């Protein structure tokens, strides 16, 4: 396997595996970096002709990596290898290009000394390069590099609605009139590959590049992915497609697709890896020279800016930064060595002091020996005492085994058996009496059935009697009515003369009734209109009343807030409760009662860097948390609550761990520095409070935004950093996401000023007073509007009530007239027939009534006869009831006896259960005694083992006990302490001496290792920096040579004067045309004095010189010929074409406003002619040659 190498001719060469391994070892020696295992990270530096730029991650690893002895040995070995082969490296690492001129800008002595040595190598290198290119041309076209642009597509970007170009692999010209949008192609290219809006000089933000009247712009760039430098070809195929979408709202996103258009990733990190693999330098202005850069480069750029462009184009600036970082790290190592020297001096002093102290303590042995004897006796005295306790427990076990409850349980079982037999006999008697009672009840049931049959017959007869009585009554009623009708007919016949006057009265009253009904209909319609008006007024009144209540609540809230602020102004502590000041004084006075002084209330120790966030932070943290106290132990918290109770303050506290500093959160490493969070806005002198808020409230994950628009642009887009969970605005409103990722908004419960977190109470009071004064007129006006609507509602309610009264009056009059008409109609006399038939029917009814009376008397006699049949059966039932009562009484007595026996049996069972429990407890007690006996035996064994470890068993004097021996040990120990007071023990002194001596050896070894490592690093860095200087000199000379060669195509001469020490680059161009024969050149050297065409041609020549040292697979330049005449343009184009033809593996893109009709197209040359788009929309027309 081989890798590409940057040669001095700007082209890629192959490195074999052996060279690659040597360079990787050198990388480890210099920066101790480890390559990321997840992606193919290309390191670029100046080492054996290869470029390597360590990333920030490598620098951080270098600073944090500990220095081990193994690494030190490796560095020593590498250093010795480098020293032995340094002469060879100096000859092989840098191959300079032969320069006919001198580097007039180089003021570095080292550079001047190496000029002669490098010239010879440069000549051979040019010859080899010329031969290589000639062989390529003869053998065929070189394969295009991976990373060249195959096509680019623009949708709704700048002036283009839809625009696509398919590039060839070598030379591409994009021609078009001014305003045709040809420059937008290069802008789209750099934007799609990751550039920011400011880099394009076409707007302050990316959304400015979205086409007018559209919402989203899409740029798609297709890159070649073939060859040795292909990026994961098995995954992406022969092309990689990068798509970037830009929204009008300012958001943007990436998609990385394979050859078939399938999305593989949507992360910018993958885009960066692809650009790094292809060596595409999108931030290098020399790689893609835009219109503005092209016009201003030679005009306005100063020597320093031009030198920076040179470094950026050749990537030397990245290596400069890397060497600077390593130099800073070496300086830090030297600072560390200085600190180690101070520590070693202190440790040497302590070692001497501890050694002297130990030698002074070699005495006082007699008392210690006596104390040791007493301690031995004390150890065995505990054994003797435990052995006595074991004997007592052994006796208790024997006594417990002698106790037994078996005889008592057997007697109770015998009595229970006797009771069970008696209960069985009683149950038999109960069954016998129960059977007799059932027989008597069956007989009674038979009698009852007979009685029921008789009663049914009796009821049937009674029903017939009642039916006949009903018919008789009906006949009598008909007779009465018929008789009444006869009399009425006779009376009406006498009144027929009065009918006409009554009919006239009925007609008159009918007209009055019609008039009243019409009036009632009018009143009903009027009421419906009034009801609608009333509903509308009520709705308006309710709305205005709601508004009034809301405004009143806001005004009262401001009043309460003003009172709170005034209370806060009187005393900052009063905002946390009455008596808080005295309570805090009491805590300070009682600090001895605490293991460590409590902290709180938390809010008193918090300061806000910007007062505008006070209410938002108070809402996010909560007032309850601000009132909280922090303690370091539970007893401290209990003591704190007791003190608070004395002042009527309920104390809430939280136990916190001991820490030494604020948590090292990842927030400051990941979040945008311009993004405000609660943690960044807060400040406190106590790191315990900050850590507590991080643990309980996650203040590092709560963002702050000025308004909803600003918060939405961060929280609900891809810009939202991972871990940022919610936002608050200055009004205390909360913005967050649900579990499914949907937006969630929660308005603040109370709005206004913060009362606990304050910076300026006077300003807050004045603001609150101004708010109250501004709201009061509107509140009074709103109350007036509500009162007017209330009066209107009452007025219309009165109209509705009056309408109801009018309707009721009409209804009463209509009813009265209706009744009067009915009464008159009832008095009208109708002509009737003869009533003789009615008199005949009356006689017939009299006969029917008489016949029914006779039938009813017969049925009553039958009923009396049937009722007499029930007597014998009822008498028999009474006798059966007497027998059942006697049997029931006897059965009750037997059942009472059964209950008594059952109760006795229950008591016996309880007694037996109690005996069984006592027996169980006795067995449990016996087992407990045995277990205790075994436990004491184990204690005896354990104490014996411990005592044996101290000494062999010794006899304890009979007059000695644990107490007496302990007292003697204390007495002798006090005497020993008295004699050795103010001195350490020999053991402690020896340990201190040994620890200090070991620390001294360890730190001395560390100092030697670090000092040796710093020497190796500094020597290696100096050697590499010298190589880099020679490499820089080689590149600058080659750039100067190529610049002069390219200028000579038009008969110009020029030079690039480098001042590496001061970072300056001066460009000189001298014209040699149209000169008198007696002159050798013009004095025109400053590029600002050149004409537009001359300056453009010089720019092309300089850029081509820089391009010779670039590895980017494609180059682009906008309006390179804008100020040239036809001659300059022809020479410039021929120069560009010839350079492109020499290097078919690279791709060139040139943008020009001219037609380029003379350009001959081929497989390797393509011309795109862009017509101006219609600004209101439409596709761009492209003609391709």
Swiss-Prot record:
Gene3D superfamilies in the cross-refs: P-loop containing nucleotide triphosphate hydrolases (3.40.50.300)
Molecular functions per Gene Ontology: ATP binding; damaged DNA binding; single-stranded DNA binding
Stretch list, region Flexible hinge: 571-807
TM segment ranges: none
Biased composition (Basic and acidic residues): 35-48
Compartments (UniProt record): Nucleus; Chromosome
InterPro entries: P-loop_NTPase, RecF/RecN/SMC_N
Coiled coil is among the record's keywords: yes
Start-end of Acidic residues biased regions: 15-29, 80-98, 106-128
Keywords: ATP-binding, Chromosome, Coiled coil, DNA damage, DNA recombination, DNA repair, Nucleotide-binding, Nucleus
GO terms under biological process: DNA repair; double-strand break repair via homologous recombination
Disordered as annotated region, ranges: 1-144
Coiled-coil boundaries: 337-570, 808-1024
SUPFAM superfamilies: P-loop containing nucleoside triphosphate hydrolases
Binding-site residues for ATP, renumbered to this chain: 176-183
Gene Ontology CC entries for this record: nucleus; site of double-strand break; Smc5-Smc6 complex
UniProt free text on domains: The flexible hinge domain, which separates the large intramolecular coiled coil regions, allows the heterotypic interaction with the corresponding domain of smc5, forming a V-shaped heterodimer.
Similarity section: Belongs to the SMC family. SMC6 subfamily.
Assembly mode: Forms a heterodimer with smc5.
Function: Core component of the smc5-smc6 complex, a complex involved in DNA double-strand breaks by homologous recombination. The complex may promote sister chromatid homologous recombination by recruiting the smc1-smc3 cohesin complex to double-strand breaks.
Protein name: Structural maintenance of chromosomes protein 6
Provenance organism: Dictyostelium discoideum
